[in-house]
Amino acid sequence: LFRSVLDGKVGLEMAKRLEGKGILMLASMEGGFRNMINNKKPVSSPADVSGVKYRVMQNPVFIDMFNSMGGSAVPMAWGETFTAVQQGTIDGLEIPLAVIDASKYFEVTKFLSLTNHTYSAIHLLVSKRTFDKLSPDQRKAVVDAAKQSLAEQRKASADNARQLVATLQSK
């Protein structure tokens, strides 16, 4: 579904708007889905967020989303988050599986809930001015490399997500 959005009309409109700002979008890669981890309870429905203090990005959309589900959104700088979970200042947070694993959040949280509540795209962008300075052969090589890397990155992202689910659920 998300790939069809990024590769379809929405993605084309986004690319068109960016180009109007002097930026070319070469590809929309996957950052994966964000999931919830906490020390209070598993989350299988929005109602389960109620009563749980979640670290969220300092962004009104995320703050409103968690507060509207009955949780307590705690905007917090990323660098403070691990210690805040460890000390009980917050109960949990929402992040991609790869970050849960790499940052070892499984060591300080009890519940991993595969909520997939937010999808993160990673856009491969280049300045139009810089791109236009390249020779036609160089431009073709850049576009071809972007297309090839897109397919490889999306496959690797999906494979990595499957592996991380198994790894994290075993911890």
Language-model regions: role of each:
Residues L1-F2, K9-K171:
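N-terminal secretory/targeting leader peptides
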